[in-house]
From Swiss-Prot:
Ranges of compositional bias, category Basic and acidic residues: 539-548
Cross-referenced InterPro entries: FAD/NAD-bd_sf, MQO
Cysteines paired by S-S bonds: none
Source lineage: Bacteria, Pseudomonadati, Pseudomonadota, Gammaproteobacteria, Enterobacterales
SUPFAM superfamilies: FAD/NAD(P)-binding domain (SSF51905)
Catalysed conversion reaction: (S)-malate + a quinone = a quinol + oxaloacetate
GO molecular function terms attached to this record: 2-hydroxyglutarate dehydrogenase activity; L-malate dehydrogenase (quinone) activity
Top-level class of the enzyme under EC nomenclature: oxidoreductase
Cofactors named for this entry: FAD
Region entry Disordered, spans: 522-548
Name of the molecule in the record: Probable malate:quinone oxidoreductase
Family: Belongs to the MQO family.
One annotated GO biological process: tricarboxylic acid cycle
Protein's pathway: Carbohydrate metabolism; tricarboxylic acid cycle; oxaloacetate from (S)-malate (quinone route): step 1/1
Length: 548
């Protein structure tokens, strides 16, 4: 019965797309150099790059909702962290010999520096306005308890001191000092409990929805940019000249139009996979998606909000994905401070918060069903974790909160459903299929269409991700003297690493902090810490990571 239902659904979708395409032929075809599918931060960032690099190119953006930045980019649908690995312990895994690996943390931090430079440049151009409306200084802290976790944090702190990107980080195991940094976390805690924390003053809270809205508003000021809302892509067809004909339905009046584009970017968040499959490019056959949602507890009580100014990340418990770390965060949303705690994983077959329950089924094909099955069979611990999260009661979530806020009161908190994150499943020659954390740009060989898949670190690295896309699909132009000069004006550190260069790191942090109105003091000498006593890591199968 399920197979019959799925087949009928696929036939209905296919017939609808054919019908739409036929109707669209009757209307005049619109032509554009660049078609941006999705009104989120990725499309907005790519459009902003291209507006500066090729101001004469025409651009069209289509968004199925009635406004831009209403899905994952919306400030309430994500954690709003400027991910720079200052506090996220999953970016510094423990090696088999007990040592700490910092390669991933360095890469994440380097990427966020590119985002800071990109945003600062847009502020200087007048594209982004009033930096405090979208980015604010909020210290980033790691907080752990228990002998093994304290040893881990000691070792992590020591390892990160090898990088110029993490200078200025503080470390303490003193209850009084940590209480000064994060009083809400320490008040009511057992004074004998062994705890440790790191703190970096230059952490940030970012409203990616506000950045998206401002970038798109600036693009709209140009006559060769068009924004079409309530417009859903129903079909993509490659033409003989390697352009694309994209059929777009107007969800308000039921009409359809064809847009002929030289380059198509699919930046549709969770919906990107299905649209990539619709394009028919062979590269799409390697991918499948698995949706995971997230919930947060939210407090707007001034007694709570005014008592906490930090993002405090913990360590994932045994058997949980490393990325699932609980955190209690100061957020600044629409000019108002709130505190969020979570995330708690949820499950829905929707690929978007405003998506369809058919999303998962309709994206499952003969080419990706086996990789999906392999991932499910190979990651039973992950399946078990997701089931346990879905089964959490209100009391369970409140008890989790009290581990980070011992004096929390139920009446101060409400539950909020954030966005959907579609995890990448990729075909693998050895394992059949693997779950991939991170984002991935998928494009055809001709560089005429590209999609962004994945969820983490996502919005905080939109600027470097779109730089990667430019290099992948516009390689010849990127290597030209003209584009090179402009890219280095947009991102001063473009083409080189900041890590290891103390002077360059401080120069870029000082520059971006000044333009973006962020706090930046010259780093002090590192804190002295007890020598970590890390043991070799036990041999055990690791839980696959996911983004929440």
């Amino acid at each position: 019965m399920k197979k019959v239902t799925a087949m009928l659904f696929s036939m209905a979708v296919g017939l609808n797309a054919v019908s739409m395409a036929a109707k669209a032929k009757a209307s005049e075809e619109q032509e554009t150099d660049v078609l941006l599918i999705g009104g989120g931060i990725m499309s907005a960032t790519l459009g902003t790059y291209l507006r500066e690099l090729e101001p004469e190119w025409s651009m069209t953006m289509v968004e199925r909702l009635e406004g831009v930045a209403q899905e994952s980019s919306n400030g309430w649908n994500n954690a709003g962290t400027g991910h720079s690995a200052l506090m996220e312990l999953n970016y510094t895994p423990q090696n088999a010999d007990g040592s700490i690996s910092i390669e991933k943390a360095v890469a994440i931090n380097e990427a966020f520096q590119i985002s800071r430079q990109f945003w600062a440049h847009q502020v200087e151009r007048g594209v982004l306005r009033t930096p405090r409306s979208f980015i604010n200084t909020v210290p980033h802290m790691s907080f752990v308890w228990g002998e093994d976790n304290v040893n881990f944090l000691r070792a992590r702190y020591a390892a990160l001191q090898q990088s110029s990107l993490f200078r200025g980080m503080r470390y303490s195991e003193d209850h009084a000092q940590i209480k000064e940094w994060a009083p809400l976390v320490m008040e009511g805690r057992d004074p004998q409990q062994k705890v440790a924390a790191t703190r970096t003053e230059i952490g940030t809270d970012v409203n990616y929805g506000e950045i998206t809205r401002q970038l798109i508003a600036s693009l709209q000021k140009k006559s060769n940019f068009s924004l079409q809302l309530s417009s859903e892509v129903r079909a993509l067809k490659r033409n003989d000249d390697n352009t694309w004909t994209v059929t777009v339905a107007d969800l308000k009046n039921g009409t359809a139009q064809n847009i002929r584009a030289k380059f198509v970017f699919i930046g549709a968040g969770g919906a990107a996979l299905k649209l990539l499959q619709e394009s028919g490019i062979p590269e799409a056959k390697d991918y499948a998606g698995f949706p995971v949602g997230g919930q947060f507890l939210v407090s707007e009580n001034p007694d709570v909000v005014n008592h906490h100014l930090a993002k405090v990340y913990g360590k994932a418990s045994v058997g949980a994905p490393p990325m699932s770390v609980p955190h209690i965060d100061t957020r600044v949303l629409d000019g108002k401070r709130v505190v969020l705690f979570g995330p708690f994983a949820t499950f829905s077959t929707k690929f978007l918060k405003n998506g369809s329950l058919w999303d998962l089924m309709s994206s499952t094909t003969t080419s990706n069903v086996m990789p999906m099955m392999h991932v499910g069979l190979d990651n039973f611990d992950l399946v078990k974790y997701l089931v346990s999260q879905v089964m959490l009661s209100e009391e369970d979530r409140f008890e989790a909160l009290k581990e980070y806020y011992p004096q929390a009161k139920k009446e101060d908190w409400r539950l909020w459903q954030a966005g959907q994150r579609v995890q990448i499943i990729k075909r693998d020659a050895e394992k059949g299929g693997v779950l991939r954390l991170g984002t991935e740009v998928v494009s055809d060989q001709q560089g005429t269409i590209a999609a962004l898949l994945g969820a983490s670190p996502g919005a905080s690295t939109a600027a470097p991700i779109m730089l990667d896309l430019l290099e992948k699909v516009f390689g010849d132009r990127v290597s030209s003297p003209q584009w090179q000069a402009m890219l280095k004006a947009i991102v001063p550190s473009y083409g080189r690493k900041l890590n290891g260069d103390v002077a360059a790191t401080e120069r870029e942090l000082q520059y971006t902090s000044e333009v973006l109105g962020l706090k930046y003091d010259k780093p002090q000498a590192a804190d002295s810490t007890p020598k970590p006593q890390l043991k070799p890591k036990p041999v055990q199968k690791e839980v696959a990571d996911i983004a929440l």
